[in-house]
Every structure is written in C-alpha cells, then in structure tokens.
C-alpha cells in the first residue's frame, strides 16, 4: 500500500511509520523540522519510501508536498493526517471559573 503520513518524525507518527515500514508499505513520510529520525528509518529502505518536508501552516507548502508525493507515489492509497498546527493561546482562556 502507498501511504502519505504527516507528522511522522516523532511520537505517534514515528511509531506508525516504523510499523508501516516493517509491513513493507511504500511511504511518503512528512516532517517539518526533524529529518534525522526519518533518515535513520529510511536508511536501508527497499520500497521507494521517502521523506518530505513541509510546514503545514503554509498552504503553498502543503500543495507542494501533495504534488511531490503524487509525482513519486502516483496517488497514495491511504493518507494519515497525524500532524497538526496550533496557535499559541493563553491557557487561562481555557479554564472555567
């Protein structure tokens, strides 16, 4: 299966990436700032998997990521949107008094 996985360089996304790679899937592994963990994961890859950088808060970078993924994978069979973006907020705004 061909999979696009966002937020794959750490945490839950990295665990998902490791498991999918172990099962032999072809992966497009998104990261924003931490490529080194994915380099180690993909070092001996034989499926054609690759990493791709994008800041998901920037619409043009998301478009570029999708185009590059389609160029390399054709169309993915599965997209796992693990990454998220958040704006900073004062935590007291979320507290009920």
List where the protein language model places each region.
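Rossmann-fold scaffold of SDR-type NAD(P)-dependent oxidoreductases
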Residues: 6, 76-84
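Conserved glycine-rich cofactor-binding loop
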Residues: 7-11
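Aromatic pocket-lining residues of Rossmann-like dinucleotide-binding sites
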Residues: 20
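Conserved glycine-rich Rossmann-like NAD(P)H-binding loop of the short-chain dehydrogenase/reductase
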Residues: 23-39
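Hydrophobic/aromatic anchor residues within beta-strands of the central parallel beta-sheet
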Residues: 49-51
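The beta1-alpha1 cofactor-binding region of Rossmann-like NAD(H)/NADP(H)-dependent oxidoreductases
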Residues: 53-65, 97
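Conserved mid-core segment of classical short-chain dehydrogenase/reductases
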Residues: 63, 86-97
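Glycine-rich phosphate-binding loop signature in dinucleotide/nucleotide-binding domains
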Residues: 69-75
């Amino acid at each position: 299966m061909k999979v696009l996985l966002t937020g794959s360089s750490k945490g839950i996304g990295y665990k998902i990436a490791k498991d999918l790679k172990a099962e032999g899937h072809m992966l497009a592994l998104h990261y924003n700032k931490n490529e080194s963990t994915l380099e180690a994961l993909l070092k001996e890859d034989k499926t054609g998997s690759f990493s791709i950088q994008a800041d998901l808060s920037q619409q043009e970078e998301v478009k570029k990521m999708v185009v590059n993924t389609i160029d390399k994978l054709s169309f993915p069979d599965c997209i796992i949107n693990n990454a998220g973006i958040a704006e900073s907020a004062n935590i007291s705004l979320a507290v009920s008094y």
